[in-house]
From Swiss-Prot:
Function: Negatively regulates transcription of bacterial ribonucleotide reductase nrd genes and operons by binding to NrdR-boxes.
Pfam families, alphabetized: ATP-cone (PF03477), Zn_ribbon_NrdR (PF22811)
Recorded superkingdom: Bacteria
PROSITE patterns: ATP_CONE
UniProt protein name: Transcriptional repressor NrdR
Family of this protein: Belongs to the NrdR family.
GN (gene name): nrdR
Protein species of origin: Escherichia coli O1:K1 / APEC
Amino acid sequence: MHCPFCFAVDTKVIDSRLVGEGSSVRRRRQCLVCNERFTTFEVAELVMPRVVKSNDVREPFNEEKLRSGMLRALEKRPVSSDDVEMAINHIKSQLRATGEREVPSKMIGNLVMEQLKKLDKVAYIRFASVYRSFEDIKEFGEEIARLED
């Protein structure tokens, strides 16, 4: 790695430690030319598939969009932010595990519903009512009945 102080090409690693529950590596480096020390962080770059929307428009996966949709459904519900983050990470892992370069938005919606069903049934119904475009109270009742099975 190039030295950020003198831009020399050669640096050496003095110390490496796992941080963030093993999800990244913190390295202390020293420049072999000017002897300045600096810290770098190394994380795996996990490429998310692109999202194919129902109108065939393709867009990059947007974690913030996923999070805001879930938080909207979970508003004023007794679910911790840690549980929400775990659910988001689970969805992202499932999307990466497909091995596909593109995934339909419908798949993401179904994965969100699956996670919300585990987290909070009311949030699940809220999300499903918008996602599936419930037209009347009968459709709500049918979905609630399916939850009770």
